[in-house]
């Protein structure tokens, strides 16, 4: 023990001499540091047993022939064994399996706190950097044997020390460092304290974190490493991104992407949910059909959304009608148009070529609608015809209206039609029964069925919009506010979301009724919106509150689905209006056209309107602003149609223009 104690002052003197060469300290500071270091070294806790100190080096004769490692100093093992046994008893005991266990040494408590990188009972997650260790080994080998022993001894002590002792050691070292050494320390630590938390965390938590990123940040995260890329490109993350942006406006970034057809299988979505929960998928749960990754879907939709935003599109013009085009509809491959020339034409969208012409009506085709098997058209000859549009055959003809048929809409079981005779007829495809809805005081220009709620919406030249109960034939409610003939009504998809503002309160100045003049007609047989006797009656009362019938029909007790919450209307007063159906409030009025609005189409992201002013406009429903105006027609735009990546307009100039926003 005396020999061990005799080496300590010599070693401390050498350390202090080295520090004096590296840094200039005042005598007071050196004295204060010496006083603070020596008690720490003379504590029994530092020596391992009472009254014993750890030796910093053995004699060169006893150690020169033994191999040395960077983190394992054999000559000093016997001297620091009590220290190692005290603080990492389990690890040290494994190296000295025959050493007796001292029951007097304190045991580690179950709630002992360690940093996660150096817990003695866990494998450290951070591995040593091999190039750095090799360089340290080479640098150490250039020193003398005594210096190697001293440094290795210090490293062994530090490695064995608990967190509190390590902090004290580091504080003492940092206190003696000069600026170059502190700079070296800062540069070395900068990279060491970086933790790859995404890889360290369970996958489901990493997915949750990445789902909060925007697309740009997510793409940047994918460039960090292979493991980050695997997580950032996973379907779980991009499915969440698609849910936030596709077919709706994201509240964070304001972007909304058009909806693709909903043909993705439900079991694939279930796979995404299982992966997000960190669960494995059984082999028998694999979908039978392969689908595009959600990232690819998002990329495709993002390109289309960007083209919509900046107006980047290609235009195809369909020419063939000999008179103005009054109605149109299209799907992925087929375009159908109806005209003043009493014909219906079927077009191939990709080639722009006419496929066939349907002839049979004796007057203007005012409305049409088609699905996979049939096309139904309405004409001013007072008839409705059902066609096999693939073969061109007229299957049946419906008669019953006393005036020209101006509008129609059908679902799987029911057809609704509006006419010049001021009535709406409901036709049942199965039992051939009909019902007449009466209440409008003028031409019925637009009808729309809502199958879920069993209701029908109608717009009329009497300046009102009505909602009807299909089961009873009664008018549920009437909406007034337009000061021109209402040409279109469109219930919006239930997915449509509108953030109500304080200025969305009921505007009583909008709820005005105007006098009617039966002698002023527009170019389509409608009354002109420039009729001199159509002055607002400012003394007219606002529309009455929601009728008790509406509340009685669509309560939770009845179990009947309510109609869509919002609807859109267009009129010859130059405006579009967005309504809240169940309250009757006009939430927003869209101004921009300089003549009456004839055509209207909408989805959850945008509205499209066509007007007498030869223009078609695209609107942002949430801000009320006109995003883009399309020109090119040489006559009034009478009809418009809309899909996720296309828009079509028909005009009295006999042309149809198709705008494609596909990437």
Curated annotation (Swiss-Prot):
Highest taxon above the source species: Eukaryota
Family designation: Belongs to the WD repeat MET30/SCONB/SCON-2 family.
Protein name: Probable E3 ubiquitin ligase complex SCF subunit sconB
Organism expressing this protein natively: Arthroderma benhamiae (strain ATCC MYA-4681 / CBS 112371)
Functional pathway: Protein modification; protein ubiquitination
Domain F-box: from-to ranges: 195-241
Function recorded in the entry: Component of the SCF(sconB) E3 ubiquitin ligase complex involved in the regulation of sulfur metabolite repression, probably by mediating the inactivation or degradation of the metR transcription factor.
Keywords carried by this UniProt record: Repeat, Transcription, Transcription regulation, Ubl conjugation pathway, WD repeat
Biased composition (Polar residues): 1-15, 56-77, 526-541
Basic and acidic residues composition bias: residue spans: 503-522
Disordered, as annotated region: 1-80, 503-547
InterPro entries from the UniProt entry: F-box-like_dom_sf (IPR036047), F-box_dom (IPR001810), G-protein_beta_WD-40_rep (IPR020472), Quinoprotein_ADH-like_sf (IPR011047), SCF_subunit_WD-repeat (IPR051075), WD40/YVTN_repeat-like_dom_sf (IPR015943), WD40_repeat_CS (IPR019775), WD40_rpt (IPR001680)
Keyword Transport included in the entry's annotation: no
Presence of keyword Cell inner membrane: no
Protein's GO biological process: protein ubiquitination
Subunit structure and binding partners: Component of the SCF(sconB) E3 ubiquitin ligase complex.
PANTHER family: UBIQUITIN LIGASE SPECIFICITY FACTOR/HREP PROTEIN, UBIQUITIN-BINDING SDF UBIQUITIN LIGASE COMPLEX SUBUNIT
